[in-house]
Structure formats: C-alpha cells, structure tokens
Amino acid sequence: LKSKKGRKGEESRKRLLNAAANEFAIWGFHETKVSEIVKRAGLTQPSFYLYFQSKEAIFEELINDFHSRVRKLTESLLLENGLHTEDVSKRVLSAVETVFQCLAEDKDVTKIGFFLNPEAKQMKKDLAMALKENLEAEQRLGYFHSELDMETVAECLIGMIEHLTDSFLLTGIKDPGSLAAEVVNLLIYGMLPKGSDVR
C-alpha cells in the first residue's frame, strides 16, 4: 500500500503534467511560464521543482509519453493471420478508429506531441516506418494487393491522420468513429462509386 505522502506526490505530479499540457497547448513552449503552470495546477513554484528540473523537462516528458503511447499503439495494430476478406475492412476500420480515439483522449498532449514538438517530423517518420512494417506484413498475408508500395501508403495514412486530427478531431468538429470511417472508405474502397462502404 502506498503511503499517503507518496499518493499525494503522484497526484501533484499528475496535476503539474496536466496543467503544463494545457498551458503548452494554448501558449506554445516559449510563451508558457512555470508560474502559470503551478497556478493552473493549484501548487507552488517550489513544488514544481520537486518533480521537474525545468520547463524543458516537463515539456520533454509530455512529448516522450505521447510518442511512446502512439508507437506502442501502432505496433499493436497488426492484423492477425487468417482473416476473411470481408473482415479486413472491419479490422482496418477498428484500427484507424483506435488511433483517432488515442489522439482524442488528451487533446492538449496530442497538440504538443504531434504539432508543437520540435521532433514531431522525426516522430511521424518513425511512426510511418512502424506502420509500413505492419502494412508489408499484412500485404504478405494477402490482405492488400501486392503492387502497393507500403511506404507510400504509410506516409499517406500518417499525413491523413495528422491533418484530420488538426482540422476536425482537436476542434471537436468530428469524432474518431466518423473520421475513421471516412479514411477507411477512401483507402479501402476508393472514390469510384461501388455501392459498398464501411458505414
């Protein structure tokens, strides 16, 4: 059983992380001040320095947590062997929706990790490579046609997710389910009329 002091410390640290995420998302890194983070968290400035060495340290922790969460998620979304053709689009829909749900979970952290992070471009490249590996494995299982260059597909998917997150998800205009359905309809069924989609 954790001590009361240990629990309180964890709660204070979490409040600081949440407050910092909100401040960074609103003001950006350079305009955010430690004094505003502690004010928003309802704590004192000395308490901030018990948990974080600097504004840079808390910013970096938010980014690293986001990157780690998204990377683990990407790696976990590999389609299993033995799916029937009709189940592939349902599983892809579920996977894309899961990604959008993850990004919608904490919009402030998503804004920081995906857009404000100076390393965001490299992080998206890393995610695209992990996604490419998944897609190539799924291609070998016969789920997608063999002529597709999965590196291009992965880059397109990351680009779509990034832009739709910025335009619709973070603004609350569309929810994860509807965005996922639109992405999957486009990628799986294309733009030509066929009479079937994932709705």
Feature roles, as predicted:
Residues 1-11, 195-199:
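N-terminal intrinsically disordered/low-complexity leader segments
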Residues 4, 15, 23-57, 61:
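Helix-turn-helix
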Residues 12-21, 37, 62-70, 131:
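Generic hydrophobic, amphipathic alpha-helix propensity
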Residues 61, 72-105, 157, 180:
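Hydrophobic alpha-helical connector segments
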